[in-house]
């Protein structure tokens, strides 16, 4: 799976990054909503805006938030060792985005 790293703590799958670029070109207001949801996830991963819900089945471990009635932001969090020389934390929590367009498939 191709991964686009926006920051050390935010990773996009290739599919999710294509979704994001689609919104940049076709509906910039959706980009604003996605950005806001990511900011909220950083503070409150399991509660807050977008009606967060844990997913089941093959998506177990992933969460979904509503971008709007049709589209969902699908994400998960995991800890990993800090990047060398970046800061003093022993680990960082990474948000991995799987998709941000359509309902999870």
Regions found by a protein language model. Give the residues of each.
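Enriched for short, Lys/Arg-rich terminal
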Residues: 1-9, 22, 28-31, 65-72, ...
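N-terminal first-folded block
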Residues: 11-47
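A short, surface-exposed loop/turn module that caps and links secondary-structure elements
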Residues: 39-66
